[in-house]
Amino acid sequence: MPSILADLTAEYLSSIEPPADDLLEEMEAHANRDSIPIASREVATLQRILAIATNADRALEFGTAIGYSTIQVARTGCEVVTTEVDADRIAAAREYADRDNVADRIEIHERPALEALDDVDGPFDLVFLDAVKTEYPEYLERSLPMLRTGGVVVVDNALWDGEVPAAHATGDPADEATEAFLEFNANFVDHPALEAVVTPIDDGTGIGVKRE
């Protein structure tokens, strides 16, 4: 989704952004060509930075797509356990991971995220929510017990292309995802197990740190 920041701000930030390497640019073009939702360059960079900052050994990702953010976190040396239901996207993710020499650090569960959790064990240092938007509350509650104290949760699309603040102002959510995010965001920033915030990074990015 496009950035929700004002045009001049978004253009400036884009102008100082380091260029992506050839593989990531190829993945971005693939996602754009086939309308595959992947994390933005900014959010994937944020994930990579957080993996480094927390010295993450293991990450849990809801929504592999073609592995764009998965690979960037794996590049830090972190093992990534990730979920995806689309076989073609999984095949692409595996091919890209092989080419990037990080396939041995990526474990893809080919099934719905909530089902995959039945076979996933913690602990994790980083959790990334980017699959079915209406399922975010369940992703959060089921992954938190597996997240170590001081571990980080990253939530993608938290402002849903500006629809969430618009719905907050009008009281009229545009769709089911918007309605779900209104409730999720309020609960996320007030969650007793987290120190959390929702930021305007890209399409809205939630960041939470697990308390003791």
Residue ranges of model-derived segments:
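S-adenosylmethionine/decaboxylated-SAM
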Residues: 41-212
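A residue-level signal for beta-strand positions that form part of recognition/binding surfaces
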Residues: 10, 24, 205
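A short, structure-level motif marking secondary-structure boundaries and short turns
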Residues: 11-13, 31-33, 79, 169-171
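Conserved SAM-binding loop and adjacent beta-strand
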Residues: 17-19, 32-46, 52
